[in-house]
Amino acid sequence: VTRVPADLSSDDIAAVRSWVIHEDAHVIAFSKPPGLSSQGGRIKAHTLDDLLWAFARSNGKRPELVHRLDRDTSGVILAAKTKPAASFLGKALQMRRFRKQYLALLSAAPDPKAATIDAPLRREEIGRESYMRVVAFDTPGAQGSQSRYRTLAAGPEGAVVELEPLTGRMHQLRVHMAHIGRPLIGDVRYGGALTTPVGPAPRLMLHAAKLTFPHPEGGTTTVEAPPPEDFAKLKTALGL
């Protein structure tokens, strides 16, 4: 499939270059801002995938995203710079050799403070939207799904947790936390609070903080991105 280069402005190019947090001959990692789609979508605005044309070489080859983040999720996202790297990383992802660690804000601390959630999910289409729902193990179409969480800080106004998906289902962390009665702040789709004791939630409060992956040249590489200002501000305002 030949893709036409996206029509990027100099501001677009400067923006995507400013998000680079790691680059070598094989991979390039970005700290994705919230509100930017990874790929596709019905919104006419540029996606991160479009913006990768800023890194196109003279032969027309350009980096390819290895995985995705939801539009309102901020943080680390990885692209492969060569076809062999894309193939290697795609296989590693399928074999669950990526370790993804997220930070999330909740209205209250989970109980227990740390646990693994093992709850199968099934995709459901409602209108033009896709949702994931927790279902029984023997439900047709059920996909095994496990997530780990641990509470990093908690107070009367909320909690900050580290979340780690052990499988790679759509919306997995969001649905699993809602399933235990602790939906993420700002997660409209899965019942999260839109307001907090200190004001409105700016978005889904989920940030991909750290990604550890096998590098095409050997060994493992870890890339980290600090939470953006909206996340850090709300966390501080909640006394966390």
Annotated model-derived regions:
Residues S38, K44-L52, K83, A119, ...:
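Pseudouridine synthase
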Residues V1-G127, Y131, F137-Q146, A154, ...:
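RNA pseudouridine synthases
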